[in-house]
């Protein structure tokens, strides 16, 4: 069922409409003139929703979408343009001026840091820089085996497709890390296992973000519970769910670009 046809979608539309009315007054009366734009660059099923929720505990930051997986591309005015329009295809060009105008209506412009999380933006950094000033890119990667498990389980994809897609994402992240100047690369593993160190890196990267809370429970989607839970590394359990026959096929694909895994500190799992 398409979200456009669901009861929940209409509830979301009501929320978005109310939010924009509220933002219209606060932004026009009290909004700042200058902002820092923070873009989370993270492939799907790599912890981006958790990272978004963690950063959103800052009182000096505004996220453009607080519903669901919290992606800016899912806001109603841009959903058909971004989410349903072959977002992972290179030949698709987005009307970024229009997208920015829409996002500005959802951001709380009283905040200094305005944040977006849209997974496909890992392949559109140069386009973003042409439209947004004062940009900061927070890039995060995750063990590709854990990502593959998520793609297979959540999307119903086979092991071959999932493995090739995971490598595609790592290629974009490698390029972003080497080309973009104002970027910070962290890993899902460090975010979960060395949380305070990761948060310190983020605060040093963009000091305006201010205080961030981590010792609370978050509702980011995971396969263990539909409720909230504290920050926890779920990689081991996810990877153990991969069938042996699928692991063999995944390894046959990963071994061809072993250097790419090693670039981010990952290894082939036998």
Residue map of PLM features:
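Glycine-rich helix-loop-beta junction characteristic of Rossmann-like nucleotide cofactor-binding loops
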Residues: 31, 104-108
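Generic structural signal for well-ordered alpha-helical scaffold segments
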Residues: 103-104, 174
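PAPS-dependent sulfotransferase catalytic domain
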Residues: 76, 80, 109-212, 231
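PAPS-dependent sulfotransferase catalytic core
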Residues: 1-100
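A short, structured active-site edge motif that brings together acidic residues
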Residues: 66-73, 140-145, 215-217
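A structural signal for well-ordered alpha-helical scaffolds and beta->alpha junctions
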Residues: 37, 48, 92, 96, ...
């Amino acid at each position: 069922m398409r979200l456009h046809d669901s009861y929940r979608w209409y509830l979301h539309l009501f929320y978005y409409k109310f939010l924009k009315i509220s933002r219209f007054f606060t932004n026009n009366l009290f909004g700042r003139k200058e902002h820092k734009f923070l873009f989370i660059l993270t492939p799907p099923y790599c912890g981006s929703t958790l990272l978004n929720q963690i950063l959103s505990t800052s009182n000096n930051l505004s996220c453009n979408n607080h519903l669901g997986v919290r992606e800016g591309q899912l806001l109603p005015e841009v959903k058909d343009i971004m989410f349903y329009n072959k977002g992972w295809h290179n030949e698709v060009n987005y009307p970024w001026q229009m997208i920015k105008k829409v996002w500005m209506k959802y951001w709380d412009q009283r905040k200094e840091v305005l944040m977006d999380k849209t997974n496909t933006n890992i392949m559109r950094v140069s386009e973003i820089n042409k439209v947004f000033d004062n940009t900061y890119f927070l890039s995060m990667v995750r063990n590709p085996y854990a990502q593959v498990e998520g793609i297979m389980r959540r999307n119903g994809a086979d092991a071959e497709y999932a493995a090739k897609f995971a490598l595609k994402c790592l290629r974009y992240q490698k390029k972003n890390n080497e080309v973009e100047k104002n970027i910070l690369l962290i890993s899902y593993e460090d975010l979960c296992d060395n949380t305070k160190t990761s948060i310190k890196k983020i605060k040093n990267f963009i000091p305006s973000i201010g205080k961030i809370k981590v010792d609370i429970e978050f509702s980011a989607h995971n396969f263990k519970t539909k409720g909230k839970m504290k920050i926890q590394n779920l990689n081991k359990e996810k990877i153990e769910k991969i069938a042996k026959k699928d692991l063999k096929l995944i390894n046959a694909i990963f071994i061809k670009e072993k250097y790419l895994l090693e670039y981010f500190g990952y290894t082939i799992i036998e």
